[in-house]
């Protein structure tokens, strides 16, 4: 009698498994259709990717050359500033902020690894998280005081995200996540997947020293993958170290603005806010 019950139990289990498999086969295609293609992200107005232009350090050429160039091209960019450098061209920076460009936080002292001799007095190896917190808050206060705007995104100086040494080393990414809408890196090798990326670690890819065909290839790759490309530069000019070339921008901006290229061209803040809204 027990063996008969066991056989009935086994047969019933097999039947249930078969029914589950059949339901999965029937429902599978419909479920996949409901989910949509893997990694799909809906950019505004049917765009296929997003691109942001950003510039670091509050260098003089940004207000002396960059402001007029971007205004002529009808483009808005994000500028990550160090307050003491803003003070040297304050009228120009006030005009830039009034023009609708985003002003972001780039710290008070631009701390990087002390392996750079010029950063030895503000070496990340000698920082604590509390010191970094105080510096970032103070930089935001000074930006408000100087330019009357609130910096809601941040760019890591030198793209470096640590404080301390050895076993005491800590990441200050969590601090940036607490204080800012987004934190941008530097010298990264890929654009951002909007469905996966960490807002406190937005990748930033270089555009200094590059010509238009080089940058266009990066934009096209981001478009094919549905990504957010944040380009990062420093000086505005025609040649020189850490210089984003004027000729390149004169071709890149119209390319990004052309509806046929299906790119959403916006500031770091606006793209970051949109992605956050989509992820809720």
Language-model-derived ranges and their functions:
Residues 52-54, 67-88, 94-107, 152-156, ...:
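Short, well-structured secondary-structure segments
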Residues 36-45, 77, 85-88, 180-196, ...:
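C-terminal domain-boundary segment and adjacent tail
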Residues 32-34:
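Boundary at the C-terminal end of the N-terminal hydrophobic targeting segment
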Residues 13-28:
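Bacterial N-terminal signal peptides
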Residues 65, 87-88, 112-216, 248:
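Catalytic domains of cell-wall/extracellular-matrix polysaccharide-remodeling enzymes
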Residues 36-63:
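Boundary/entry segment of secreted carbohydrate-active catalytic domains
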Residues 52-54, 121-130, 239-242:
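Second-shell loop/turn segments in exported
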Residues 1-11:
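N-terminal secretory signal peptides that target proteins for export/translocation
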């Amino acid at each position: 009698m027990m063996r008969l019950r066991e056989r009935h139990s086994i047969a019933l289990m097999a039947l249930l498994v078969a029914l589950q498999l059949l339901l999965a086969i029937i429902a599978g295609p419909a479920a996949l259709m409901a989910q949509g293609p893997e990694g799909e992200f809906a950019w505004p107005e049917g765009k296929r990717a997003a691109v942001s232009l950003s510039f670091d350090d509050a260098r003089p050429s940004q207000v002396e050359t960059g402001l007029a160039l971007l205004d002529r091209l009808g483009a808005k960019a994000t500028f990550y500033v160090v307050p003491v450098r803003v003070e040297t061209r304050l009228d120009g920076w006030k005009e830039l902020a009034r023009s609708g460009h985003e002003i972001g936080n780039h710290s008070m002292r631009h701390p990087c690894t002390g392996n750079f001799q010029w950063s030895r007095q503000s070496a990340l190896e000698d920082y604590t998280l509390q010191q970094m917190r105080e510096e970032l808050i103070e930089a935001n206060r000074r930006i408000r005081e100087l330019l009357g705007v609130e910096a809601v995104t941040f760019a890591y100086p030198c793209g470096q995200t640590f404080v301390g040494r050895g076993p005491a080393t800590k990441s200050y990414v969590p601090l940036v996540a607490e204080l800012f809408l987004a934190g941008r890196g530097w010298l990264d090798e890929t654009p951002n997947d909007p469905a996966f990326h960490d807002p406190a670690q937005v990748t930033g890819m270089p555009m200094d020293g590059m010509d238009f065909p080089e940058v266009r290839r990066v934009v096209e790759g981001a478009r094919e993958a549905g990504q957010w490309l944040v380009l990062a530069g420093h000086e505005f000019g025609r040649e020189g170290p850490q210089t984003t070339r004027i000729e390149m921008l004169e071709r890149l901006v119209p390319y990004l603005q052309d509806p046929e290229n299906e790119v959403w061209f916006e500031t770091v803040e606006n793209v970051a806010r949109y992605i956050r809204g989509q992820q809720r």
